[in-house]
Amino acid sequence: MIRRPQSSTGRARSGLQQGEEYKNWLADFAPIFKELLEPRGSIVMEVGNAWEPGAPVMSPLALESLLEFLKKGDFKLCEQFVCYNKATLPGPTQWVNVERIRVKNAYTHVWWMSPSSHPWASNKRVLTPYSKAMLELLKKRKYNPGERHSEHVIGQESFFKDNKGAIPSNVIEFTNTRSRDKYLDYCREHHLKVHPARMAMNVATFFVKFLTTPGKLVLDPFAGSNVTGAAAEQLKRRWVSIEPQEDYIASSKGRFPRPGRAQKLK
């Protein structure tokens, strides 16, 4: 299950009471989603950062909401990720652009949770290309073994095995700066509303590959423009996406190139 719930930082959501309402709203889904998961299934949740209204102070609402969801569902926190958007616009405007007393906020929290301590996962499915230095090392089979300043001890042959790629970190980089893609072109052509807070495709693709195998079912209960469904479709996973706003459902058809498939999204 991959989910990006409605933002905790929405302009209409300012003040403690509304923040508490958001936290409780999110946490109430935890036991419901737990019933839908297989015992070794996973939930991946992305939540943006929040600022206190009228002050250059960050709110702990995002972390509090994740903690409350974790607690109410009795989930295990398998790993925390950071999604870093290196091309994000500066903001909040007053504190970053006008008064210049803060730096731009360029990341979101992503928590991977599961009812199990050992959910289905394999980092072999999400390996990244080796660096030029690593490729040279594999070719020359020569490096300096021994103890490092970090107290790690590197063996004589520790880096000689070719694993076909490097293990990725828990920091995922992406940009959402493209002015043209199939989804945006489809929205323009059919005069449809573009979703304003689309999940990055490579984020959804990473977790679908990491946590599932072909044929498994992926659910996104807050689908928006259905990035998760499109990623699952490309990776030959079954998928179900839920979205209450019909205009976003209509625009999501642009993510699916086959006309026959798109007709099923109603």
Predicted regions and their residues:
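Core catalytic lobe of class I
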Residues: 1-251, 257-258
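S-adenosyl-L-methionine
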Residues: 257-266
